[in-house]
Amino acid sequence: MTIVLTKEELLAKAKKPAEDAMRLHPFYRGKVQVAPKCPIRNVVDDFAVWYTPGVAAPCRAIQENPDLAYEYSSKSNTVAIITDSTRVQGLQVGFAERDIRAVAGLPLMEGKALLFKYLGGVDAIPICLGTQDPDEIVLATKWLQPSFGGVNLEDISQPKCFRVLDKLRSDPDVEIPVWHDDQQGTATVILAGLINALRIVGKRWDEIRVALIGAGAVNVPLLPFLVASGVKLGNVVVCDSKGILHPERKDVEQKKDDYAGKWQICMESNAEGRRGGIAEAMRGADVCVAASRPGPNAILPEWVAAMADESIVFTLANPIPEIWPWEAKEAGARVVGTSRGDFPNQINNSLVFPGIFRGVLDVRAKTITDEMAIAAAEEVACWQQEKGVDEEHIVPTIEDADVFPREAAAVGVKAQEQGLARLSLSHAELLSRAEQTIRQAQDMTQFLMDKGFIQPLPEK
C-alpha cells in the first residue's frame, strides 16, 4: 500500500537531499576519480611500456589506423559529459542565463558520471564549457571527439539544445555517438512506461489521443517516438505556456529557425484544430504527458476527469508534479507516473542512459538513432512484463540492476542491424560483456569501500 504524505511532509523530504549534499560534497571533494587499469609492478620497467619509449609503437599504429584507438586506449569505454550549465537544476531560478558560471554545473556532471560508471560500467568525464554559444559548443565537441567513444550532452538550455544535437548528429565529421539525455533519454523512458500502461488499459497506439503539456526538451523529441510506435500525429495535441499549438501560432512561426521542431508540430499535429489551453488539450485524451511547470495545481483534477476512460497521466515536473498522483487517480486516471522516486512509476532517464551507452560502446557505434532508443524502451518494458506489470509497476527502477545489460544488448543488436556498428557481436555476447563490465564496476566500488579507500559517510 502506498503511503500518502502531506504536501508539507513531501516538501520537507524534498529538502533533505540538498541539506545532505551540502554536508557531504566538501567531505569527499568530488565523486569520481581516475584509477589505473594496468598493473604497475616496477616503476622504471613498467612505465617504459606504458609511457616512453614503448608507447611510441601504439601511437604509430593509431596514426596508420585511427580505429585502433579503440583497442590501444581507453576511448572504447570513455564518454564526455558536455554542458554549458545553463539548465542545471538550482541555477535556473535566481540567475540570468548569461550569468550562470559553467563551473557551477560540476557537481551535477560528476553525479552523472557516477551513474554512468555504477549502472553502465562507463567511464565518463565531466566537461563544463566556458561558452554558451551553440556553434562554439558544437565546435568544442568536434574538437574533443578524438579522445572519446561517445558524447552525452547535458543541461543545455533550449532552443540551443535542439540546434546543438541536430548539428552534431547530422555532421559527417562526427564519427562517435552524440546523445542529449534531457531529450532522448527522457523520451525513451516515457515510451517504455506507455508501452506497459497501454497494455494495462487495453488500448492501441493507433487509436489513442495524446495530450502533451509542455513543448520543450521532453515532449518535442518524444513525439517522433510516439509516431514511430503507431500514434497518429493528428491525434496529438501539444500545449505550451501560451496555449495549444496550431498553424496560426505566429509567435512560434516567428521563431521557427530556432524552434523548427515546434513549428512542425504546429503544422502537422492537432487534426481537429483545437484552440485553448491545457484543459482543452486534455479533453478526451487517452494519454497525457506533462513536462511543464512544477505543481501542484498546474493540472487540475477536473481536467483529468474530462479525459477518456482508463486514462494514463504522466506528470514529470520537479520537485512537485503538475498534479499529485492521488489527485489524478481520484479524478479517474488509471495509470499515473511521475519523475519522483517516492511515488510508484518513476519516469527517470537514469533508467536508460547507462545501458544505452554500454550498448553503443560495446559495438563502437557511430551514432545513436531513434530506433536504437526505441529498442531500449521496448527492452525496458519487456523486462517489467517478465517481472509483472500492474498499475504501480510499469517500469523498473534503477535498483533493478539486470535491466541495464539487457538494454545494452538490445541497442547493440539494433546498431548492427542499421549498419552503424564497427563490431559484430551476437546478442548473447553483448549481454555477457555488459553484465561483466557493469558487475566489475560495482564490485570495484564495493572493494574500495570495504578497504577504506572510499571513506564511510561522516557522522552528522
Residue ranges and their predicted role:
Residues T2-V178, K414, A441, T445-E459:
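N-terminal ligand-binding/catalytic initiation module
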Residues Y70-K75, K117-Y118, W143-Q145, R169-P172, ...:
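Solvent-exposed alpha-helices and their adjacent loops that cap or buttress functional pockets
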Residues Q89, A96-E110, G120, P172, ...:
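Glycine-rich phosphate/diphosphate-binding loop of Rossmann-like nucleotide-binding domains
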Residues P126, N152-D155, V178-D181, V238, ...:
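General beta-strand structural signal in soluble alpha/beta enzymes
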Residues R163-K167, P172, G243, F404-Q440:
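Terminal amphipathic helices with adjacent charged low-complexity linkers/tails
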Residues D181, V201-K203, I312-H427, L448-K451:
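Adenosine-phosphate binding glycine-rich loop
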Residues A260-R334, R340-D342:
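Rossmann-like adenosine-cofactor binding region
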